[in-house]
């Protein structure tokens, strides 16, 4: 029987990091030494780390910044809002995806750049002729981190879906701006302007109302029923109030927003 290659503690930890965090395959995980696949497997078994199937390894071949949602920032808060409104988390797999209409593809491109996602955005046309774009990636770490902020699988019916109370309050405006870009609108209603955003739970609606109140802006909540699901709409009516909302939402160090909505907002405020 051949003599086993002796590795240092640091080398073993690096192999484990490459395999579990960076999602490298067995060969790539040990390439920095270099050692063979069998040596990598021995180290993984030594520390009781499950060996991935070929399918799992192939899914994780393309890179994504797995730790992105572990560090709060204005941009991170914004992406929580986008994912909370338009994102989907797969129940069984570690897949997260967002589908938007093609005209908003710029937003997906920004997110792809932010999380360093190597998977290209997919453009497609639905059976009804709608042109959409889809971004997706696989990450166990991001799925776990999003759950801490109550962005979970099957969010329409999940009791775990809710307001991200772990988010620093100074990033609330960025989170709400993300929700607005995902499920909100600015429009003329009668002779004045209405700003609105739809959310999936009354808790989120009340919390957003409270946040606006803290910033001297009064908004209302209404209830809509769509396909046996209750939607909670937060809205502000009137040019003066909408001007306050605009000033607050876009007074941020982040440069993330949906350009067409911001431009329409500005045009209606003229």
Model-identified regions with their sequence ranges:
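Internal intein/HINT superfamily modules and their associated LAGLIDADG
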Residues: 1-270
């Amino acid at each position: 029987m051949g003599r086993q290659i002796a590795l240092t503690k640091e080398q073993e930890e690096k192999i484990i990091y490459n395999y579990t965090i960076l999602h490298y395959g067995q060969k790539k995980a040990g390439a920095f030494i270099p050692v063979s696949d069998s040596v990598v497997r021995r180290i993984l078994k030594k520390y009781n780390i499950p060996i991935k199937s070929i399918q799992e390894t192939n899914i994780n071949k393309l890179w994504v910044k797995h730790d992105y949602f572990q560090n709060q920032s204005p941009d991170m808060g914004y992406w929580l809002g986008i994912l909370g409104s338009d994102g989907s988390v797969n129940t069984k797999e570690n897949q997260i995806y967002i589908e938007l209409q093609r005209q908003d593809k710029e937003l997906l491109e920004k997110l792809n750049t932010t999380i360093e996602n190597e998977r290209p955005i997919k453009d497609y046309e639905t059976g009804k002729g709608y042109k959409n774009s889809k971004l997706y990636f696989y990450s166990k770490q991001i799925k776990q981190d999003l759950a801490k902020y109550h962005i979970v699988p099957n969010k329409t019916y999940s009791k775990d879906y809710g307001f991200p109370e772990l988010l620093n309050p100074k990033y609330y405006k960025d989170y709400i701006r993300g929700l607005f870009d995902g499920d909100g609108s600015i429009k003329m209603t009668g002779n004045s302007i209405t700003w609105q955003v739809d959310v999936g739970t009354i808790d989120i609606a009340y919390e957003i109302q409270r946040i606006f109140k803290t910033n001297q802006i009064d908004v209302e909540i209404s209830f809509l029923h769509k396909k046996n699901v209750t939607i909670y709409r937060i809205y502000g009516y009137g040019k003066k109030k909408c001007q306050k909302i605009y000033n607050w939402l876009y007074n941020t160090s982040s440069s993330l927003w949906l350009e067409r909505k911001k431009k329409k907002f500005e045009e209606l405020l003229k």
